[in-house]
């Protein structure tokens, strides 16, 4: 089976990708989205989102990385897809699933689910602009407020020439509510298409991954939030390994505080460490205690001192 690390805006940046791929066995990472509006973006934008471009589009541990684009104008999606791959990205992905109100308000992400023809035009333009040996992939949800158009959406992706499709098993309106996950609908899409379909949504451990694959028939999954709850989740999902022990999680956090974010003004780790602990608290009691000890701190250096001082 393949396990992919999902794009998560404001969460899974290059530093977190570096950490997680070092202790996992991911087959691929997708970047946070590059927002495309009405221009060919400068090279520095791609390097900021995906510094791995400077290293053959791989993390330090060797996991391939693919740039994701977010936008609605086929011409500019195509030109930026061509630039991304010219810079070395291992293919390019089109975001048709982000449920953020800010993103949707500008016509991107899940908004495209209301217009399968636009998904087709965007993906087709990207496919034409990217060398044929490199993948062009698309990530979608089941629909905007219902799954009634899920086949129309999936057909648009395949007919555009996409290499594979990632399907998050909920509509935009359903957000991330667990009770609405529909792996069976993903399976119906998989049966309809000839390109590979990757299942995404509510995969937290070995059991849920097995259930997802059994229900959907997919042999590949993409994991997002769960990868932060259990830092070695790909190995849990692939090999039924136990979750990472807390002392190893601490070691990972300690390394994180030592990594430097380009352009950081001393605040980067404040938000990111607290955010990550918010995920870890769902699996580790110790994470709650650590969060309480740093919640009032507002400088990266202060948080680093607390975490580095933990005895393991």
Swiss-Prot record:
Regions that span the bilayer: none
Annotated active site: 98 (proton donor)
Residues reported in the UniProt entry to bind FMN: 7-9, 68, 139, 200-202, 224-225
Site (Interacts with tRNA): 35, 95, 176, 272, 274, 279, 295
GO molecular function: flavin adenine dinucleotide binding; FMN binding; tRNA binding; tRNA-dihydrouridine16 synthase activity
Catalytic function, reaction form: 5,6-dihydrouridine(16) in tRNA + NADP(+) = uridine(16) in tRNA + NADPH + H(+); 5,6-dihydrouridine(16) in tRNA + NAD(+) = uridine(16) in tRNA + NADH + H(+)
PANTHER family attached to this UniProt entry: TRNA-DIHYDROURIDINE SYNTHASE, TRNA-DIHYDROURIDINE(16) SYNTHASE
Protein name: tRNA-dihydrouridine(16) synthase
Species: Salmonella typhi
Gene: dusC
């Amino acid at each position: 089976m393949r396990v992919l690390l999902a794009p998560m805006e404001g969460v899974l940046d290059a530093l977190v990708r570096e950490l997680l791929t070092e202790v996992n066995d991911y087959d691929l990472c997708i970047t946070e989205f590059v927002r495309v509006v009405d221009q060919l973006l400068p090279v520095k934008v791609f390097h900021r989102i995906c510094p791995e471009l400077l290293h053959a589009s791989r993390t330090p541990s060797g996991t391939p990385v693919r740039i994701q684009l977010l936008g609605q104008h086929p011409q500019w999606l195509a030109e930026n897809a061509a630039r991304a791959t010219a810079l070395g990205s291992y293919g390019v992905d089109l975001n048709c699933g982000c449920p953020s109100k800010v993103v949707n308000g500008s016509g991107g992400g899940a908004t495209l689910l209301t217009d399968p023809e636009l998904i087709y035009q965007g993906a087709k333009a990207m496919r034409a602009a990217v060398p044929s040996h490199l993948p062009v992939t698309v990530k979608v949800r089941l629909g905007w407020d219902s799954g009634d158009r899920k086949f129309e959406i999936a057909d648009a992706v395949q007919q555009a020439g996409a290499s594979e499709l990632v399907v998050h098993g909920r509509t935009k309106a359903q957000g991330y509510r667990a009770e609405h996950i529909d792996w069976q609908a993903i399976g119906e899409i998989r049966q309809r298409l000839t390109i590979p379909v990757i299942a995404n949504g509510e995969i937290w451990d070995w059991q849920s991954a097995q259930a997802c694959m059994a229900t959907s028939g997919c042999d590949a999954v993409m994991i997002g939030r769960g990868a932060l709850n259990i830092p070695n989740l790909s190995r849990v999902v692939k090999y039924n390994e136990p979750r990472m022990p807390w002392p190893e999680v601490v070691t990972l956090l300690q390394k994180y505080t030592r990594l430097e974010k380009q352009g950081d003004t001393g605040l980067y780790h404040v938000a990111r460490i607290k955010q990550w602990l918010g995920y870890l608290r769902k699996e580790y009691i110790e994470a709650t205690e650590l969060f309480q000890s740093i919640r009032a701190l507002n400088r990266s250096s202060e948080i680093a001192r607390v975490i580095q001082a933990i005895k393991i």
